[in-house]
């Protein structure tokens, strides 16, 4: 698909870029050093109507499309990857499941304040034994009649403990795997719901990340999201869309590093000329720009498919995988272009280099993205009943023995064809299937 954004998209980009340059970039280094959440900037994003950018106005959103959302995450991440993922996790993970699977009452109670930016959302799926394999979920929700009793914990939860509303996944029916997982809307402040320490991360340090702890938390029956047993389906559908946000975050980080390196290469003089004039470095810049454009096309095309309710799971996995892979490459090249200066704390490219790494890990590692893509291309191969072996469709037996060079000479043409068909059937072939 040849893709071109609209004038409205580019006007939105300019608006968010101006905000990011004025409100986020000047404090990005201090946020990183202090491991500090940009509360004031997030509040202003809500006032600008950007915390509910892809949701209908009737639910407090801006009523814009999925590409607009990707642009918003991209532009924030261009100056600070942590701020970008705050928006991504809030919109894609904390709000979208309620929009897509919630009742009207749940949407009015929870989605509206989330979309208006009055509250922050988060998504509780990952556990110590349930990372890439969500089927390892151990948090439980036991039906107690008028409520569920929630026990367990979640780790690496983006926006915790700053978020007010959490979509949490727990086992309601044990011993049946992913079919026994359900989703719930849980509020901060409920008795028994506590938080672990804020993680001290390598990158995206302005993004708050913490552990969720549930000790006999009473969850009202009306806070079940979807139906019992639909939790895994809700989680996977949510992650499909969330990968567009993480891809946009990775792209934004890489874009910021590229722009900084490009500008520096024009100013830095060695051997009597700007280093950008050195062919080896110019080629590096050309490769960086090409990777950025490829990533942007993948992201926007996946967002376009999502917007038009077309299947997009494979495309969002491709976008997330590729954008995060090239983010590592581009930020690495940016540090290399800066040389020793780029290795110093306080340099944007040094921070971006650290920020980029997480994009290959969360919302499905890039190894998992390749599994997702391959499953779309190849299809599912069912497990055999014994020894974990795979069963595949039985292939027709090859023509061997006397028929390998058999020539049908007897009878008229129709008799020869009939004899050939019978011989093929005996060998497992049947090209008459489907012929009336």
Located regions from the model:
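Short Gly/Pro-enriched turn/cap motifs at secondary-structure boundaries
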Residues: 114, 129-132, 156-159, 173-175, ...
